[in-house]
Every structure is written in C-alpha cells, then in structure tokens.
Amino acid sequence: MPRSRAGLEEASVRIQQVPFTVTDWSAVAASEHPGERGTAFWRTFEAGNIRARIVEYSPGYLADHWCNRGHVLYVLEGELETQLRDGRTFTLKAGMSYQVEDDAPAPHRSFTKTGAKLFIVD
C-alpha cells in the first residue's frame, strides 16, 4: 500500500550533511579487521551521520564482539549467520537483509562458513 509523501517523511531516517555522491566501490581501499576467527575487509564511505560499507568476510569468519549498533545489512553474495546473544540464529543468503535498531535488547554478531559479501548502512 503506497504511503503519502508526508507519511514517508515522518517515518524516514534523517540523513544529514551527505551531499549527492557517487561511489566506485572498487576504487575504495579496503581496511582489514580480524575477527575471533577469519578476517573482515571493509570498503567504507562516511559522510554526515551515515556510514556505508561493502564488507567481505573470509570463510570461517566469526566476529570478535557482540554488536549493539543499529544497521541495515544486505547480503550481496554468500551466506551469513547472524547470532543474537539471546541464542537465536538467523541464516541470510544473497538477496536477504536484516534491520536492527541501536542498542537492541539482544546484541548480534556475524559468522560465515563459506564467506560472504555485504552492503551495510549504519
């Protein structure tokens, strides 16, 4: 059901101090972030109040921390297991996403057996 323009403005996130920008992700240098196991490689764009990233996890990657930050995460390639500290686990394949608020009741962390490539905005 379509929402009115006014309804979209009320419900949307305020992205501020981010001028129109085109990003060639292949030209963005990757930074290396070791996990508890494996490695994450981040290509990051930051402006204003947002951070957008292409993140590639090596096979066997397990995050070294439980995360409380809110994200919109979209799986571009591979398969990702998102573990919640409360014991729940969700498997996401290419074309799937999750959304989580800042300081959610159950922090999350990432694991992948085969490797994964993600697009994340936070």
PLM region descriptions:
Residues Y57, W66-T82:
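Short, conserved beta-strand element in jelly-roll/cupin
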Residues G48-C67, E101-A104:
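Conserved short histidine dyad/triad with adjacent acidic residue
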Residues L62, E79-Q83, S97:
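Short beta-strand segments in beta-sandwich/barrel cores
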